[in-house]
Amino acid sequence: MCIAGKNIIFVAGLGGIGLDTNREIVKSGPKNLVILDRIENPAAIAELQAINPNVTVSFYPYDVTVALAESVKLLKTIFAKLKTVDLLVNGAGILDDHQIERTIAVNFTGTVNTTTAIMEFWDKRKGGPGGVIANICSVTGFNSIYQVPVYSASKAAALSFTSSLARLAPITGVTVYSINPGITDTTLVHKFNSWLDVEPRVAEKLLAFPTQTSLACAKNFVRAIEANKNGAIWKLDLNRLDEIEWTKHWDSGI
């Protein structure tokens, strides 16, 4: 996908990997970049606008845990303004295994609901034009960080959901791929809670191993957007972008 001239919605795009990715996206000249996030950050919005004044950067408050109908309502407002949307990035995520219900609600259910909501406008069975979705999952969807099993499971669920949607593209007209960052040096990983406090020093131990910067991850994120490969499972780790070949152990046959 050539980003230039496109209309993009980025969920949770004002911090960490999301903000750095949006810094790279605006350099490529989309027509509109719409950021949905829980907390407004006027300084970040102004910075993105200043990077490329030819891009219209806008913000709408959004919590991915709201009811599906609320997500549809917000997207209806955005589509009424932009007329078309080319790319949706689902980037909401938390890392705190003390918050079991919220971890699942944000990392998995929120992705499902926002995706389901945009199908109201994209699904070709309803006369929609189709579209592209990039879901930010995690390398923990491949192999868990066992001290945070809830987080790891939520990301594995998001990855499975994404892979299923890619298989449905001939029916819906919506193509989908997953973005799976490795351990990235952001505030998210500097302090977090393990499940039942099984490892109080989990963040410290994790950061003892090589990491990548959010900027390096962001640059590879944009490369994945440009590649625009339906069903791709992208690993963004240690400054590299690699497509993962998933090992099939079972097939429904349908």
From Swiss-Prot:
Residues recorded as binding substrate, renumbered to this chain, are S138
Organism from which the protein derives: Scaptomyza albovittata
The primary gene name is Adh
SUPFAM superfamilies named among the record's database cross-references: NAD(P)-binding Rossmann-fold domains (SSF51735)
> Which one of the record's GO molecular function terms can you name?
alcohol dehydrogenase (NAD+) activity
The UniProt similarity line reads: Belongs to the short-chain dehydrogenases/reductases (SDR) family.
Q: Catalytic center at which residues? A: Y151 (proton acceptor)
Task: Note the PANTHER family from the entry.
Answer: 15-HYDROXYPROSTAGLANDIN DEHYDROGENASE [NAD(+)] (PTHR44229), ALCOHOL DEHYDROGENASE-RELATED (PTHR44229:SF8)
Pfam families membership: adh_short
Q: What is the protein name stated in its UniProt record?
A: Alcohol dehydrogenase
Q: What InterPro entries does the database record attribute to this sequence? A: ADH_Drosophila-type, NAD(P)-bd_dom_sf, Sc_DH/Rdtase_CS, SDR_fam
The lineage's top-level taxon is Eukaryota
Task: Please name the PROSITE patterns in this protein's record.
Answer: ADH_SHORT
Binding positions for NAD(+) per the UniProt entry: 10-33
